[in-house]
């Protein structure tokens, strides 16, 4: 394993595989904050050159957090398909990149190979790809998952309807939900971040969203994004009724601990929701991630934030989720500084999620102190649509009045669908057409008019 190279008369040498991964990463303010980023463009190029010549085996044998010390590492390593791994372990990262991008390599071939790749290897492949590579490769991979409906079928761009409310008010949540439905959002999930993380609040919102779904016979799934332990306690109660179990996850055991979560807890939640939940299909978990969360809890172990993010996906695939999405700008400019970094992180995350075999979505968002704006979000949303992202977020005017950040709007989702000739999930599309919200591949005559729910 060679960890040095010569470039323009200068020798660049790296301490270990973790250092190569970090120095090969595209510029991120979080990596600079952590002191692991490349010190120059030439050093970054040199690291990419070294990384490209490492093998799949080199990456597996050198996880960024030791196997003996970390439950996330153990899950990633133990889930590897040894037969597939034996076939590709001698391939270099550069060879894997070229093979994935080859026109003769289809989704089925990539998905089989992915079972032999650790999260570090997947991160490595992404680090030597340009943005166009990430878009092209991401769009080649087709992954489906089923809760009440199936996400990931051909030419579908789904949307999470996010009807958040500052006090979890039933009337406000209902109004926002009906408006979002009238614009065609909500086929991925109707999912609310509660302002109050209690069992009673979770039960109340489950009932509110469930009543709307049942009253109007909407083919979708609902979710309340309270802590996993809150959801489990709520589901065990007599009033408990849910489709999906949500939890934010991270790429190390220590970072999970900062969220109040363990891998055993996630296994318990998956089993409970399969037993007592109302999902018709086998995929009952919903995970959110985001570059920088491990660093923010001092649990990155000297690794770069994109490699740690990839490890989130290695953890996620263990639980066969229905939905996974990166909340790409939510951590703020301390981790993702500006639009350039936001674009790169979004494309990296969707590609790495897909190469893990996940139905990958993205919350294209930013905090109010980032040097970016809605025009940038709309551009990124369009890029992700071409990259095959499974779903994005639909919020009223792209403004979350509870979490106080900016995302993408109901109108944005409809526009990208029309532009790229994408459709909602088929059963949901049929439901929209019945109500006049969707016609001939775009918004219909009743779009944006939730009053029709009270006149039929």
Which stretches of residues belong to each language-model region?
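Catalytic alpha/beta core domains of metabolic enzymes, predominantly
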Residues: 233-383, 387, 392-396, 400, ...
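Alpha-helix-loop-beta-strand connector modules within alpha/beta enzyme cores
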Residues: 73, 133-139, 153-155, 159, ...
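Intrinsic low-complexity, glycine/proline- and repeat-rich
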Residues: 442-456
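Glycine-rich, proline-tolerant flexible connector loops at the mouths of alpha/beta enzymes
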Residues: 112-118, 122-130, 189-206, 327-340, ...
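Glycine- and small hydrophobic-enriched segments that form the cores of compact globular domains
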Residues: 149-245
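N-terminal small/glycine-rich loop or linker at the start of catalytic domains
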Residues: 66-72, 141-165, 284-298, 360-362
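Internal helix-turn-beta structural module
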Residues: 382-383, 390-395, 399-444
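Long, compositionally biased, glycine/small-hydrophobic-enriched stretches that function as flexible linkers
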Residues: 1-141
